[in-house]
UniProtKB/Swiss-Prot annotation:
Function: Component of the phage injection machinery. Required for injection of the phage DNA into the host.
GO BP: symbiont entry into host cell
Family of the protein in this entry: Belongs to the podoviruses gp7 family.
Positions of the UniProt region annotated as Disordered: 14-36
Entry protein name: DNA transfer protein gp7
Keyword terms, alphabetized: Viral genome ejection through host cell envelope, Viral penetration into host cytoplasm, Virus entry into host cell
Gene: 7
């Protein structure tokens, strides 16, 4: 009978559906708050780390797009001609070409072939050789930048996936903590216990040959009380 009165007070809201563990200090509620704070702290750290990683990788990822555009441009004949024209008008080309021409003429003069066809062909090949070497170097440089950008983008994608997974887990933990703190978990257990008790009670009534649902009602009450206390 005492349990029946206590059940009535619980259902009317005069008493909590589940008692606080740890006596008057309410350590269960305090523990839930501490767990919630710890989970929130972990979520904040996760967010800070994600932002830090994205910020650090951003310059490298940004370098990949211009490199890709340059490679695409240099992959066409028009783009190569435009780039070579700019190179041939640069100071770098003039210095290298003058140096190569000077070395060829000195070598030809030393061997007596200053006016030979071989010397003329060698001097004529300076411009295309320097141009192709420069173009190949540019393609390689842009390719290296593209690889850096791809690696940074992959790192950002990995960081984003890890952040999503960890944030989802932390959100589930927070929801579970709040659910336990509000008594929803205990109430769900009580309802489950009441249902199980009702089934057991119905079976008991069937064994006794009773034609009324009292057996199910008694079983439900026992199951509910067992879950709440």
């Amino acid at each position: 009978m005492l349990y029946a009165f206590k059940l009535g007070r619980k259902l009317r809201g005069e008493e909590p559906l589940y008692p606080e563990k740890g006596g008057k200090g309410g350590s269960s509620s305090s523990g839930a708050k501490e767990a919630a704070r710890a989970t929130q702290y972990a979520a904040d750290l996760q967010n800070q780390q994600f932002n830090r990683v994205m910020e650090q990788l951003a310059p490298y990822a940004a370098a990949g797009l211009p490199a890709l555009q340059q490679i695409q441009q240099l992959s066409t004949l028009e783009g190569q001609n435009s780039a070579l024209n700019q190179y041939y008008n640069s100071d770098q080309y003039k210095q290298l070409a003058d140096q190569a021409r000077y070395q060829s003429l000195n070598a030809a003069e030393a061997t007596g072939g200053l006016g030979s066809t071989a010397t003329s062909n060698q001097i004529a090949s300076i411009a295309p050789t320097l141009g192709q070497n420069w173009l190949s170097g540019q393609m390689q440089n842009y390719g290296n930048l593209l690889n850096v950008g791809q690696s940074a983008a992959a790192g950002q994608a990995s960081a984003g996936q890890n952040y999503a997974n960890n944030a989802g887990n932390l959100a589930q933990q927070m929801a579970a903590i709040r659910s336990q703190g509000s008594g929803q978990s205990t109430l769900g257990s009580a309802i489950s216990g009441g249902t199980s008790g009702a089934l057991a009670g119905a079976g008991l009534a069937g064994m006794l040959g009773a034609s009324t649902p009292w057996g199910a009602g008694i079983g439900a009450g026992i199951g509910l009380l067992g879950s709440l206390f």
